[in-house]
């Protein structure tokens, strides 16, 4: 009987040690979900994300103060408006006179400035105005205007991480098939070959 008691005590001690070992294993700091270090790290990430969101909100509010048009939240509509706007923009520049008068040059300059300020997407408008400030509108000829427009479009493409457009074909690509008053088509054929 003494042996049974000793054996029973040994089993109880082993079981108790096993339970204590399992408890220690599952409640250790390295494995615990409630580990202060992990909570601190997670809260640090949340703080960084929160700060970034606040900074973005502040940036958007500042943009809204500086633009006429409101922000455009619908990305699908923003892309559709963008495609249509670029088509109009490039076609307009490709139709500009070869040798514009000072009045025509001023009108194009004014129009592009208003086009940028009144663009229906507030954030896009803000960036477009900043680009025009950095890269002023070129109005000396059709080629200068079209190449400037292509350069500006490529700056937007860079910002949006899109492919860069080959500006060498801009006048051909936006030749609307229209004719001058003398019946000649407006296209790259009318332009002298541009070197450089």
From Swiss-Prot:
GO: which molecular function terms? flavin adenine dinucleotide binding; flavin-dependent sulfhydryl oxidase activity; thiol oxidase activity
Q: Does the keyword Endoplasmic reticulum apply?
A: yes
> Which membrane topology describes this protein?
Single-pass type III membrane protein
Does the keyword Transit peptide feature in the UniProt annotation? Answer: no
Keyword line? Disulfide bond, Endoplasmic reticulum, FAD, Flavoprotein, Membrane, Oxidoreductase, Signal-anchor, Transmembrane, Transmembrane helix
What other comment is given for this protein?
Present with 259 molecules/cell in log phase SD medium.
* Subunit comment: Homodimer. Interacts with the substrate protein PDI1, forming transient intermolecular disulfide bridges.
UniProt protein name = FAD-linked sulfhydryl oxidase ERV2
Q: Which organism is it from?
A: Saccharomyces cerevisiae (strain ATCC 204508 / S288c) (Baker's yeast)
What's the source species' lineage? Eukaryota, Fungi, Dikarya, Ascomycota, Saccharomycotina
What is the name of the gene encoding this protein?
ERV2
